[in-house]
A protein has these predicted regions:
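Histidine-centered divalent-metal-coordination microenvironment in nucleic-acid enzymes
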Residues: 106-122, 211-215
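Terminal catalytic/cofactor-binding subdomain
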Residues: 1-102
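Short, conserved secondary-structure transition motifs
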Residues: 116-123, 153-160, 254
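Conserved small/polar residues in nucleotide/adenosyl-binding loops
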Residues: 252-261
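Beta-strand-rich recognition/accessory modules
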Residues: 197-200, 208-245
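A common structural junction motif
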Residues: 29-34, 100-107, 137-139, 234-244
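Aromatic/basic-lined ligand-recognition segments
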Residues: 55-58, 128-218
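Helical (often loop-to-helix) elements that flank the catalytic cores of nucleotide-handling enzymes
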Residues: 28, 89-96, 120-145, 221-237
C-alpha cells in the first residue's frame, strides 16, 4: 500500500484563544458558519463542502492560558479535531493551523498532537508488525522530536515489553486474540478512557474505534511540522502493512546499547 492511500485524522491540543473564536476562524476559512453542538465536550463544528465536520472541543488535560501567558478559564482549552482525511487534505489542515495561530492559538504546556490512521486494512500479523517497528524506532523518534518527558511518562508511554514479548511468542491469528493480549484477558474495548490508551502506539484505539493512534507528538502551531508528523505516521503504517514480518530481536539489542550509552 502506498502511504498516500491511507485515511487519517488528527487532534491538536491548543490554547491562547477560546473554542468559540477557534470555531469562527475555521468557519471563515471554510466559508461556513460554525455550529455550537454543546454536550460534555462543549463542541463546535464546521462542515466543509464535502459535508465533513471539523470540530473544536473541550479537553480537560489542556493547561489554559491566554496568548500573553496569563492563566485562563476552561473556554481556552481547545482541541482541534479533523474529520476523516485523505492525503490531499494535508494542505487544508496546515492552513487551518496557520489561521488559528494568526488568531492567537499557541501550543500550551504539555499539550500534544494525536494522529489516527485507518486500521481497516490491518490484520493480526500487521498489528504485530507495527508494534515491532515502533519498538525499534521509538527511542530515536522520541529523541528527534524532543518529546516532553512528562508527556512520555504520563500520556504517551513506549511499547510495553511484556506486551511485545507475548505478542511475538503467541503470534495471534486474529485481531480478537491481539485484543486479549493488549487488555491482558480483560476486555476494555468499550471503555473510551481505558488506561491502556496512554501509549505512543495506542492499540486500544484499534479495538475501540478502528484507528491506529500515534500519541507521541508535542503540540505545535508550525504547519510544516504537522505535515511531517502526519507523513511519519503514514509511512510507519505503510511499512507495517507492506512488509511480511518484523522482528524485535535486533531492536532489543539496540535499546540495550542506547541505555548503556
Amino acid at each position: 500500500m502506498d502511504m498516500r492511500e491511507q485515511k487519517f485524522g488528527i487532534e491538536i491540543e491548543l490554547t491562547g484563544l477560546t473554542r468559540k473564536r477557534a470555531a469562527e476562524v475555521i468557519g471563515k476559512y471554510l466559508g461556513q458558519e460554525p455550529h455550537y453542538d454543546g454536550g460534555y465536550y462543549e463542541e463546535y463544528s464546521v462542515r466543509d463542502e464535502q459535508g465533513r465536520k471539523w470540530k473544536v472541543m473541550y479537553d480537560s488535560s489542556i493547561v489554559a492560558v491566554k496568548k500573553g501567558g496569563d492563566s485562563a478559564g476552561d473556554e481556552y482549552k481547545v482541541e482541534f479535531v479533523s474529520p476523516i482525511c485523505e492525503y490531499a487534505d494535508i494542505p487544508t489542515i496546515q492552513e487551518l493551523v496557520r489561521q488559528l495561530r494568526h488568531a492567537g492559538a499557541i501550543a500550551g504546556e504539555n499539550a500534544g498532537i494525536h494522529v489516527h490512521v485507518n486500521a481497516a486494512p490491518y490484520t493480526a500479523r500487521t498489528l504485530r508488525n507495527i508494534t515491532n517497528i515502533m519498538y525499534c524506532k521509538e527511542d530515536l523518534i522520541y529523541k528527534a522530536l524532543q518529546v516532553d518527558v512528562e508527556r512520555e511518562h504520563r500520556y504517551c508511554k513506549k511499547v510495553e515489553e511484556s506486551f511485545l514479548q507475548e505478542l511475538n511468542q503467541k503470534k495471534p491469528k486474529s485481531i480478537e486474540e491481539v485484543s486479549n493480549i493488549w487488555y491482558r484477558g480483560r476486555d476494555g474495548r468499550n471503555r473510551h478512557y481505558h488506561e491502556s490508551r496512554y501509549h505512543c502506539l495506542n492499540l486500544h484505539s484499534v479495538f475501540q474505534k478502528g484507528t491506529i493512534e500515534f500519541r507521541l507528538f508535542n503540540s505545535t502551531t508550525h504547519a510544516g511540522k504537522i505535515k511531517t508528523y502526519i507523513q511519519l505516521c503514514l509511512a510507519i503504517s505503510a511499512q507495517a502493512l507492506n512488509q511480511s514480518s518484523a522482528s524485535p530481536v535486533s531492536y532489543t539489542h539496540l535499546r540495550a546499547h542506547e541505555t548503556r550509552h
